[in-house]
């Protein structure tokens, strides 16, 4: 069915979001059109505000509204441990369990030879710089249990062990192929408590 151009454009915009197919995009577009002008204006304002005000922490790579972020500047955090994650959403999942008190480093992706993503394509250089100028003695690799997550964790292990840094990874209470951001708090807590050395 042909929709008027403004709705078709809105459907197209929604369908560009991850996990949103054409049917859901259509539903969202029609819902948005049915919202009050005040609600639409607030939604648009919040979207633009988030886009303008958020940045990536220059230290850890986490999405934040201050740089460096509040975790990197918190003197009460354990400065000897860095938890390496794929995505900023994973930081939020780990913080929710309130059991890990060290620092983070967000890679913004994983090494994926099949997709042409090499170590140079993810946020590894800044991790190496951090490790050279710090008291970090352990790096916990918390990549998802996928082929790319495993490739990334093995690469980090081979890179860091010769430097005398202990490299561990989360215990596998996480199902293979599962995303950390969707894991429940008990599973994440057990994974961090029972991490294994690589």
Swiss-Prot record:
A zinc finger (C4-type) spans 57-72. GO terms for molecular function: DNA binding; zinc ion binding. It comes from the Bacteria. The keyword Lipid metabolism does not apply. SMART domains: TOPRIM. The keyword Nucleotidyltransferase does not apply. It holds the Pfam family Toprim_4. Keywords: DNA damage, DNA recombination, DNA repair, Metal-binding, Zinc, Zinc-finger. Residues 80-175 form the Toprim domain. HAMAP family: RecR. This is Recombination protein RecR. It comes from Streptococcus pneumoniae (strain Hungary19A-6). The gene is recR.
